[in-house]
């Protein structure tokens, strides 16, 4: 969030991102960040973790373990269900999506989203995609 982009710039970048399927310098810059490296390392610890997306306070992607299908997450339920600029927040402290096919991960996933705070201020969200076919069953 240190580098705030205007809404117009976010939308322009999102449009280019979708059109070029994430093959652009901005996606490379995000993927090569230290935070993206940490997300990638965490996701590699379990085979059922498929994706991790860290957003800023406008829903823009600021870190990821793999290139996402779009840059702006701000219009998606994983962001809108939990992000709140009001203090105290009146939204849930987590969100679990319905299972769905995900083109980025090529798997049937559920997304678990939580808010990210800096002190008392909600500064973004973290979403983790979980491959439901790989989650260990407690009876096996």
Regions inferred by a protein language model and the residue ranges of each:
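Conserved beta-strands of PAS-like sensory domains
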Residues: 64-65, 107-139
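Solvent-exposed loop/turn segments at secondary-structure junctions
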Residues: 58-61, 68-71, 102-105, 130-132
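Short loop/turn motifs at secondary-structure junctions and domain boundaries
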Residues: 42-47, 90, 102-108
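Residue-level detector of beta-strand face positions
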Residues: 53, 98-100, 115
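Extracellular/periplasmic ligand-binding regions of membrane signal-transduction receptors
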Residues: 1-34, 60
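Extracytoplasmic/periplasmic sensor domains and loops in membrane signaling proteins
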Residues: 21-39, 66-100
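Short N-terminal helix-loop-first-beta-strand/juxtamembrane motif that initiates sensory/input modules
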Residues: 1-7, 41-60
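Short coil/loop residues immediately preceding or within conserved phosphate-binding loops
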Residues: 49, 94, 111
């Amino acid at each position: 969030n240190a580098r705030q982009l205007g809404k117009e710039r976010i939308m322009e970048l999102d449009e280019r991102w979708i059109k070029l399927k994430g093959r652009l310098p901005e996606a490379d810059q995000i993927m090569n960040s230290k935070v993206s490296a940490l997300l990638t390392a965490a996701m590699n610890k379990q085979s059922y973790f498929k994706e991790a997306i860290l957003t800023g306070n406008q829903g823009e992607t600021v870190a990821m373990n793999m290139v996402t299908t779009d840059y702006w997450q701000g219009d998606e339920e994983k962001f809108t269900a939990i992000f709140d600029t009001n203090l105290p927040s009146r939204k849930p402290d987590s969100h679990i999506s319905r299972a769905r096919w995900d083109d980025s991960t090529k798997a049937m996933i559920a997304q678990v989203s939580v808010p990210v705070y800096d002190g008392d201020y909600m500064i973004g969200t973290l979403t983790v995609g979980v491959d439901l076919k790989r989650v260990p069953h407690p009876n096996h």
